[in-house]
């Protein structure tokens, strides 16, 4: 997972889908950029999608709607330097192998100090599902 050096919170690599890009290709690109890991294409399996609807941070009268796709995959060991941009660069995110229960505890303990608490809760809930379904056994 990516750990923010500012907050100590955890997120999976992710980001926007570029024009003409599939969600799977976006996942592989973002994983390389943010974590320096090369996704093994034959290993990619769709896990699910979280549909996020909330007040828009830029205007309380508008809604922000986002679909967050999750994939299971294997990746080659860190093969490239991280080249994060935007939010991930600002947070000083670094790749860290972490026990999923520890990541859940840290994210839920972050409180309101984190700019996007719903993101942390989303990641915690996805990790809980993965644990319940035996993916970390």
Sequence positions of predicted segments:
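The catalytic Nudix box helix
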Residues: 12-48
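Active-site-adjacent beta-strand/loop module that shapes the phosphate/pyrophosphate-binding cleft
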Residues: 51-82, 96
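N-terminal strand-loop-strand
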Residues: 1-12, 24
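Functional cleft and adjacent loop/helix regions within the main domain
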Residues: 19, 59, 135-137
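Nudix hydrolase/Nudix homology domain
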Residues: 8-10, 80-137
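Generic beta-structure capping elements
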Residues: 2-5, 74-76, 98-101
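Hydrophobic pocket-lining residues within nucleotide cofactor-binding pockets
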Residues: 17, 50, 75, 100-103
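Membrane-topology and secretion signals of cell-surface/extracellular proteins
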Residues: 37, 44-48, 62-63, 68, ...
């Amino acid at each position: 997972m990516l750990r923010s050096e500012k907050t100590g919170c955890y997120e999976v690599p992710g980001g926007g889908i570029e024009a003409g890009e599939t969600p799977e290709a976006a996942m592989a690109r973002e994983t390389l950029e943010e974590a320096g890991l090369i996704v093994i294409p034959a290993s990619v399996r769709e896990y699910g999608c979280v549909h996020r609807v909330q007040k828009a941070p830029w205007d309380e009268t508008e809604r922000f709607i986002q679909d967050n796709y999750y994939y299971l995959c294997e990746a080659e060991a860190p093969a490239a330097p991280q080249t994060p941009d935007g939010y991930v660069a600002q947070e000083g995110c670094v790749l860290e192998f972490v026990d999923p229960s520890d990541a859940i505890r840290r994210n839920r303990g972050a409180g309101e100090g984190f700019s996007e608490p719903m993101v942390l809760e989303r990641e915690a809930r996805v990790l809980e599902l993965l644990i319940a379904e035996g993916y970390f056994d």
